UniProtKB/Swiss-Prot annotation:
Protein's cellular compartments: Cytoplasm
GO process terms (BP): amino acid biosynthetic process; aromatic amino acid family biosynthetic process; chorismate biosynthetic process
Residues bound to NAD(+): 71-76, 105-109, 129-130, 142, 151, 169-172
Function text: Catalyzes the conversion of 3-deoxy-D-arabino-heptulosonate 7-phosphate (DAHP) to dehydroquinate (DHQ).
Catalytic activity, as annotated: 7-phospho-2-dehydro-3-deoxy-D-arabino-heptonate = 3-dehydroquinate + phosphate
Coiled coil: none
Source organism superkingdom: Bacteria
Cofactor dependency: Co(2+); Zn(2+); NAD(+)
Record protein name field: 3-dehydroquinate synthase
Broadest EC class assigned to this enzyme: lyase
Any Pfam family: DHQS_C
HAMAP family attached to this UniProt entry: DHQ_synthase
Amino acid sequence: MKRLTVHTAEKAQQYPILIAPDLIKNASLWHLYCSAPHIAIITNETVAPLYLSSLKAALTDKKVIDIILLDGECHKNLATYQHILTTLLEAHLGRDGLLIALGGGVINDITGFVAATYQRGICWITFPTTLLAQVDAAVGGKTGVNHACGKNMIGAFYPPQAVLMDTATLSTLPPREFSAGLAEVIKYALIYDISFLSWLEQHMDAVLRKEKISLENMIMNCCRYKSEIVCADEREQGMRALLNFGHTFGHALETITAYRHWLHGEAVAIGMRMAAELSEMRGLISADEKARVISLLQRAHLPTAIDIQLNCEDIYQTLFLDKKVRAGQLRFVLLSGLGQAHVVDDVTETEIFAVIAASRSENESFARF
């Protein structure tokens, strides 16, 4: 079992990340972290048939309720949040209760937000079942829901008391979902560690085959990178903002399509390509380096171009709904080279339109799984 401790400097808290196969069946581990008398498991219609019974079997001496939500980013909203709150209140879950997030990034985000706000805050544990959640959403304490006007506009910083990652859950993950998670993996390599970029280029085939050692090493590296960044900047006042590489463009694409055309990781992949285009336009990276970015994304079976008709002006205006906008200025994370990045707030409308045009090449295609 691999173990990592995340330190949150602001509140002087820490919580463990445990990584191993078959954690869901480890009753002694669950009892170690689930001392609460009343537990609510929040999951969705896709994950519940796969893992809910195994988790409940490990908690037989507890009073456990489950809340099964509809699957998809389009359900990460205030209506779903309200439904969860009502269910918890009707079940008389007290402040000594515990929430368990059983699922991917959407389940992680909404469960954490409920935990942050229900009766002014209760404990929660996250058990991420997707690659995207394991390498990104479950680490760092960001929680929230979407609003019709923008992604993750309502939320809180509220870390869990533990993150339990069962790598065996990735065996049931559809190929498209697995590739979506690889977008966040590639992000760390591009902004933080060029040696990890080389490792991914060498091991991508093994990762796609879900080979155990490669998979565990990759996940551990990503969790370590994010924990280092979160420890230095929990509330995104500085270094943590670099984790938004590809997300400003990506969130706009998700918002404008109502979260129904691309998975989050797919939108981020296109967003990273767009950020790489902008970085090259500004002379920050070479054409060969940009090509290296696009090549790795494509090897991971990720889209790198806008494949539907979207109006440039609509995309541009949607960018301003991003929560990272400051004093009316868009903020983008650009590459300073491969393995390093920085934030800029002086990108012009002309540059953005040029990036959009360059990122919808008809010579590129993406075959959905």
